[in-house]
Amino acid sequence: MAKKQHIYLGLLVIFMMVLTMFAWQMTANAWPSNEELTFLKAFLYYQSYIMPFFLALVIWGFKHKQVSKSFMLIAVIGCSLGIYARFIEPNLLLVKETTIKTGYSLKIALISDMHYGLYSTPWQMQRLVNKLNTLEVDMVLVAGDWTYEPAKNSSLTEQLAPFKQLKHPIYSVPGNHDEEMPGPPLAKELKQALIDNHIHPIEAKTVDLGKVRLVGLADLLPLATKEIRLNALKQQDKPLLLLTHNPESLEYLPKLTQPFVMLAGHTHGGQVNLPILTEKILHLLTEQGYKRGMYALDNNNQLFITSGIGMVGLPLRFAMPPTIDILRFE
C-alpha cells in the first residue's frame, strides 16, 4: 500500500514539474508588463490542473483509511468548487437581454473585457464571434479591455482575425489593459489590428445613429488626454449613447444638456461573486462599488455595466459567467 502511495505522489510531483515548464513557456510567449508577475499567473493557471488528480488522490486515501472523513469532505467541496470556477464557468457563454426606456429604438450587443492573452484560447474567441453572428442586433459595442498580456509571437491582427467574420457593425473603445494601465505598450498595434479586422475604434469620436449619437469615451483614466476624449461630447443635438470602459468615467463628464445612457465594463461583476464579500471588495476598490447591471442616475440618465467575457488576476469565474448583454432601447 505504501509503495503504491509513493508511486502516486511521485507521479503527481512529475506532473507538477511538467506544468511548471508549461508556465515558463507561456511566460516566454507572452507580451508581459512584468515577467515575474506573468510567470506567477501562468504558474497558477497550469497548476490548477492538479485539482482533479489531488481530489482523486484524497478519495483514494479515504477509501484506504489514510485520510479522515472530515478532510475528505473539505477536499471534495473545495476541489469541486475550484474545478467549476476554473474549468467550467469560464467556458460558459450566456446571453442576457435588458430593456432600456429611452424613447428611441435600437438593439445592440454589448461585450467587454475579453482579455485575450494569458487565460484565453482561440476557441473561445471563435465561439464568441459565432454566437454574436446568431443574434439579431443592429450593432456590437465593445467596452474595452481586449487584451491581457497577449502572445508576442504573432501579430494582434492575426490573433483577432475571427472578428473579421462578424456580420454586424462593431464599434470599440480601449480599456485600461489596452493602454498600459497595467499592460504592455500595445495601444498603437491594437488600434491597427482592430481596423484591419473591420472593427471601428471610436475613442474620442462620435457616430450618428439617427435619433441618438454614439460617443466613444474609452477609459478616461489617462488624464493627459482627458480633454481630447471629452471633445466628442461637444455636439449635443440629440440623446447620447456613451461607450466607455470604466463606469467611474462618470466622474469626468461635463454637464450634459441631452439625456444619456452610459455603457461600461471593467468590473467583471466581481469575477468571483461571493455573497457579501464581493460587494465589500468592490466598494473598497471603487467609490461607488459598481458591479454589473442597470443603475439609475440623476436627471433620468442611466448606466449599464456588463460583466464581461474574460478573466484577470486569478483564472477563475464563479457565479458571474461570461455574458453577452443584449440591450433593447425603446
Model-found features: residue ranges?
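Soluble catalytic domains of enzymes that build or remodel membrane lipids, polysaccharides, and related
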Residues: 104-110, 115-330
